[in-house]
């Protein structure tokens, strides 16, 4: 059920239990904010081996997370659409399997907290965290909360909202996690930005 990735120097350490689980993925829109949060945890002194991602087998997390040096566990299945179809029935069975695997994983690892980002893998982990009494934070990146996040937000200790007025319980306005290099680029002057991009200073773009 998964793949793991660590830096070379961390690979020599004994296996550690994760302190945090970041659950979600299936799309880059769900995954990238989680990677930003994970990098910030490392910056604050946590080892990469203690920040565990849980995602979907079919999502970009299967390659992107190990490339960034974090462990990842991949759950089977796919998201459920709104219509009642044979594919949705199969997806429902896949979600049940994923929930069982997530429950066993969280029961074994007992992380301090779970961050749910959206997508079916986050539903499986969020429901398991609620059953086990593990603190759950739901983070939504949209002005209108996604269906997965709306479903599990009722179990959350708190919800991190990117915009004011998002209809989630116990919501705290945090904005979206942003990579440091993007923040740095936003502070450049027009002249500096043109120079970085190799654009002439005297032409209209």
Q: Would you name each region that the model predicts?
A:
Residues 17-23, 47-97, 174-179:
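Conserved nucleotide-sugar phosphate-binding/catalytic loop shared by glycosyltransferases and other
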Residues 87-89, 184-199:
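A short helix/loop element that forms part of the nucleotide-sugar donor recognition site in Leloir-type
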Residues 52, 60, 130-191:
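Active-site-proximal region of nucleotide-activated glycan assembly enzymes
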Residues 90-105, 192:
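Glycine-rich, highly charged phosphate/nucleotide-binding loops
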Residues 200-205:
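Conserved donor-binding/catalytic core segment of Leloir-type glycosyltransferases
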Residues 1-55:
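N-terminal subdomain of nucleotide-sugar transferases
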Residues 102-121, 137-139:
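Short N-terminal targeting/anchoring amphipathic segment
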Residues 59-63, 113-132:
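An aromatic- and histidine-rich active-site surface loop
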């Amino acid at each position: 059920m998964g793949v793991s990735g660590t830096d070379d120097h961390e690979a020599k350490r004994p296996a550690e239990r994760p302190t945090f689980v970041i659950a979600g993925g299936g799309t880059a829109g769900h995954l990238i904010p989680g990677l930003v949060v994970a990098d910030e945890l490392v910056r604050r002194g946590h080892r990469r081996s203690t920040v565990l991602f849980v995602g979907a087998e079919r999502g970009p997390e299967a390659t992107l997370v190990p490339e960034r040096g974090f462990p990842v566990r991949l759950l089977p299945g796919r998201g459920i659409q709104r219509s009642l179809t044979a594919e949705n029935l199969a997806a429902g069975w896949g979600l049940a399997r994923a929930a069982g695997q997530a429950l066993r994983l969280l029961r074994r690892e007992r992380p301090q907290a779970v961050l749910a980002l959206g997508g079916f893998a986050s539903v499986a982990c969020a429901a398991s965290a609620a059953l086990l009494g593990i603190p759950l934070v739901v983070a939504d990146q949209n002005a209108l909360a996604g269906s997965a996040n709306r479903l599990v937000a009722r179990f959350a200790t708190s919800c991190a909202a990117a915009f004011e007025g998002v209809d989630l319980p116990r919501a705290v306005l945090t904005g979206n996690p942003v990579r440091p290099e993007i923040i740095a680029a936003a502070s450049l002057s027009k002249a500096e930005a043109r120079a970085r991009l190799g654009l002439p200073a005297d032409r209209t773009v």
